[in-house]
Amino acid sequence: MNGTEGLNFYVPFSNHTGVVRSPFEYPQYYLAEPWQFSVLAAYMFLLIMLGFPINFLTLYVTVQHKKLRTPLNYILLNLAVANLFMVLGGFTTTLYTSMHAYFIFGPTGCNLEGFFATLGGEIALWSLVVLAIERYVVVCKPMSNFRFGENHAIMGLALTWIMALACAAPPLVGWSRYIPEGMQCSCGVDYYTPSPEVNNESFVVYMFVVHFSIPMVIIFFCYGQLVFTVKEAAAQQQESATTQKAEKEVTRMVVIMVVAFLICWVPYASVAFYIFTHQGSNFGPIFMTIPSFFAKSSAIYNPVIYIMMNKQFRNCMLTTLCCGRNPLGDDEVSTTASKTETSQVAPA
C-alpha cells in the first residue's frame, strides 16, 4: 500500500520513513508546503466572504418580496439554504483546519464537516433533479393540464432533503465513515480503504449509483425531451412568442445551473471513483485536494446564476439594497420567474 491507514484516517503517503502522523493531532507539512495550506485557507476565506452574503441575500430578498414566492423559486431557495449549510457548517471548519495544517477538531469535527459538505452537495443535486422534472412536466406536458403548484414544490423540497440525508447520514451511524482527505484539512466519504468493519465498499457503490448516476440519468433524460419539445413547438408556432421566450429563459437558467454543477462536481466524483477502484495505488495529496476544494465553489454559482439571469429577482434585490428604490428605474414584474407557473408549451 502506498498510503498509511490508521484509526479513522488514511494518509496518501507511505510511512516507510516513519514521518506520517495522525491528521487529527499533528500538522501535515510532510504532505505539502506551508504556503500550500495557506492558499487553501485563503481560498476558503474567499468562499465564505462570497458564499454567505450571496446566499443570505437570496433568502432575504425573497422574504421581503412576496411576488418572488413562486413554486419554482422554492426549489431555488432550497439551494440557497443548502449552500448556507455548507458555508456555516463546512467552510468555516475547513478554513480553521487549513490554517493549522491538520484537522484540529478531531474525528467528531470530521464527521460534522463531512456530513455538511455531503448534505449540501446532495441537496443541490436533487434540487436540480426536481427542477429538471418541473421543466419536463411544464414544457413537455406528459400529463395534460398539469400545473406545478405549491404542493408539488413542497413535495420536491421534501424529496431533496430525504435523499440528501439518505446519502449523508449513513457514515455517521456505521455504514462507511468520514475521514480527512487530500491534504487532510477537509473530510469526505472514505473512498480509500475497504474498511469491511463498516461495509465501506457497499456504501460507496450505493452512493455512486443512487446518489450520482440515477440523478444524472433523470436530468439528462428530462432535458433531452425538453430540447426536442421546444424545437418542435417553435417550428410549428404552437405558442405565442412571449410564452416561448419565457420558457426558454427559465430553461436556459436551469440548464446553466446543471452545467455549472457538473463542472464543479464531476472532477471530484471522477477522482473519487478512480481512488475507489484503485485502492492502495500511488497518488499524492494534491490529487484529491484540488477537485475537493473546487467542488466547494458550488456554494456560490447557483445564486449568482439566479441573480444574473432572473430580471425580476435582480430588480427586487436592487430595491432591497437601495432602501426601497431601484436605481435602474426598472420595476417590471412580468418576468421569467413569474411566467413559469402559467407557461404551457405543448408537445408536437
Curated annotation (Swiss-Prot):
GO molecular function list: 11-cis retinal binding; G protein-coupled photoreceptor activity; metal ion binding
Residues with a covalently attached lipid (S-palmitoyl cysteine): 322-323
Main location class: membrane
List of residues that carry Phosphothreonine: 335-336, 340, 342
Membrane-protein topology: Multi-pass membrane protein
Key word RNA-binding present: no
Residues exposed to the Extracellular side: 1-36, 97-110, 174-202, 275-286
In-chain residues carrying the UniProt-annotated modification N6-(retinylidene)lysine: 296
Annotated site residues (Plays an important role in the conformation switch to the active conformation) in this chain: 113
TM spans (from-to): 37-61, 74-96, 111-133, 153-173, 203-224, 253-274, 287-308
Annotated positions binding Zn(2+): 201, 279
Pfam families according to UniProt: 7tm_1, Rhodopsin_N
Keywords: Acetylation, Cell projection, Chromophore, Disulfide bond, G-protein coupled receptor, Glycoprotein, Lipoprotein, Membrane, Metal-binding, Palmitate, Phosphoprotein, Photoreceptor protein, Receptor, Retinal protein, Sensory transduction, Transducer, Transmembrane, Transmembrane helix, Vision, Zinc
Ranges where the record places region Interaction with SAG: 330-348
PTM description: Phosphorylated on some or all of the serine and threonine residues present in the C-terminal region.
Keyword Zinc: yes
Record text on subunit structure and interactions: Homodimer. May form a complex composed of RHO, GRK1 and RCVRN in a Ca(2+)-dependent manner; RCVRN prevents the interaction between GRK1 and RHO. Interacts with GRK1. Interacts (phosphorylated form) with SAG. Interacts with GNAT1. Interacts with GNAT3. SAG and G-proteins compete for a common binding site. Interacts with PRCD; the interaction promotes PRCD stability. Forms a complex with ASAP1 and ARF4. Forms a complex with ASAP1, RAB11A, Rabin8/RAB3IP, ARF4 and RAB11FIP3; the complex regulates Golgi-to-cilia rhodopsin/RHO transport in photoreceptors.
Recorded family membership: Belongs to the G-protein coupled receptor 1 family. Opsin subfamily.
Record's protein name: Rhodopsin
Organism, as annotated: Mesoplodon bidens (Sowerby's beaked whale)
